[in-house]
Amino acid sequence: GHSIGETYLQLASASTNVVKPLEYYQPHNLLLLEAVPGSRIAHLKNEDLTEGFSGLAQALAAFHSASIPSQLRRFRRHDPDRLRNCTRIIAMARPDVASVANKLDRELRSTIPSGQSLVCLHGDVHPKNGIALNGLVTLIDLDQSAIGPAAADLGSMLALLHYNWRIGLITRKRERELASAFLDAYAGSRQLPAQRSLSWHTAAALLSERALRSVNRIRPEGLRHLSLLLADAREILRTGGVNS
């Protein structure tokens, strides 16, 4: 809608490292964006991938420091009612994990971090939404941008890395390398959120993104590891990490 076009314009004027809108045609809700040269971070390998994660974190830190556009909605994915609905859907589809899902939901809702400062969130942070070129990363796909705590974006990425390890796409060592590169680069540009907030939003993202999408998008590997993913989220919430 028109708000998407206006939001892209405002985001592009507030941050230099996002895709630039060229034209918005309201009758057809058509938004034309500038072509972004480079490679999606998801397509990089080895050391280039590590550097891509660092660049993505730096771009995200700059995005979080930008002025918040007036049209942005509030980030709601981790609201208690949304988390409860995720749990309900997961338990309905997979009664065998209902108990651990409900325990996670209760623990999340009883430990919601307070006093989190609000920033301009990307809202859909993953390696396909960053284009790397000569050490710099441009953020794309801004349609889920919202106002919320920085830990929501960071936790989403950490949850994805954890998911990729748990289903066997990457090793535990590689998960930690990429997570460290991501967080260290962010910290080099902007103060990291408190560890408690980061752990909470990582656990919330494992529930509301990784576990839920395994169910409603029928992802076989996620479904196979669903019980472990939910247990991992509880462990991350309690201790900040998972032993392996």
In which residue ranges do the predicted regions lie?
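Conserved hydrophobic "DFG−1" position in protein kinase catalytic cores
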Residues: 23, 34-35, 127, 131-132
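A glycine-centered beta->alpha junction motif in the catalytic cores
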Residues: 27-49, 61-69, 83-94, 163, ...
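Regulatory N- and C-terminal appendages and interdomain linkers associated
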Residues: 2-4, 28, 95-99, 137, ...
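An alpha-helical support segment within catalytic cores of ATP-dependent transferases
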Residues: 69-122, 188
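Active-site activation/catalytic loop segments of kinase-like enzymes and analogous catalytic loops
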Residues: 151-190, 204-221
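A conserved alpha-helical element in kinase catalytic cores
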Residues: 1-27, 44-62
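Extended hydrophobic-aromatic, low-complexity segments
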Residues: 1, 33, 42-44, 72-73, ...
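Active-site acidic catalytic loop and adjacent metal/ATP-binding pocket
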Residues: 108-152
